[in-house]
């Protein structure tokens, strides 16, 4: 009888862990702009970048550093736009230190409050009119739906 009770308690504990993991993942992905809202200053983006994923990044984010190392101009080319939430001078200095990023499409006129971003990196997928159709927390550029 005690054995069955212990097994049930362990099973409930494992179920709780899986449930909390799913809740935390959902909560993390729910940051940022709501889906179906217009992306701010979409008209300022280069015309070739308007349908590509926009990855909101920071120069101090450790996961973002991995994304920068993973970025390859031959593979990703102009298929990704990096939107930095740091000030322009910091971004300029950062790009000088990372030569592989010089050919990347980079914008730095956004701030965290404008995009409702607390944690970076966060990727936005926009439609042709500039509305957010999907968003996701990413740890690799391979997770992005890149148009060929």
Please place each PLM-identified region on the residue numbering:
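Short active-site neighborhood of thiol/selenol oxidoreductases, capturing the structured segment around
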Residues: 44-74, 78-83
